[in-house]
């Protein structure tokens, strides 16, 4: 859960740098490695998105490029 929280903080930092906000998120594709508590994951994502509902895809992977990393989120955002 800590890596998921950190991933969202990185997303928000990049959104701010581009003068964007959560409402500008269009699509999230999340890759997870290992066992995850579904209820905790859903609660964290819901709290981070604060009611915004972009298109989302969740995939479980055997591994990511760095074995220490257990979560990766590919984000699309758009604004005028």
Name what the model sees in each region.
Residues 1-80:
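Short, polar/acidic, helix-capping and beta-turn segments at strand->helix junctions
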């Amino acid at each position: 859960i800590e890596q998921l929280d950190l991933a969202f903080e990185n997303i928000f930092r990049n959104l701010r740098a581009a003068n964007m906000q959560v409402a500008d998120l269009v699509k999230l594709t999340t890759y997870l490695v290992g066992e995850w508590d579904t209820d905790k994951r859903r609660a964290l994502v819901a709290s981070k998105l604060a009611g915004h509902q972009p298109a989302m895809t969740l995939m479980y992977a055997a591994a990511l490029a760095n074995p220490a990393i257990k979560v990766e989120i590919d984000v699309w955002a758009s604004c005028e």
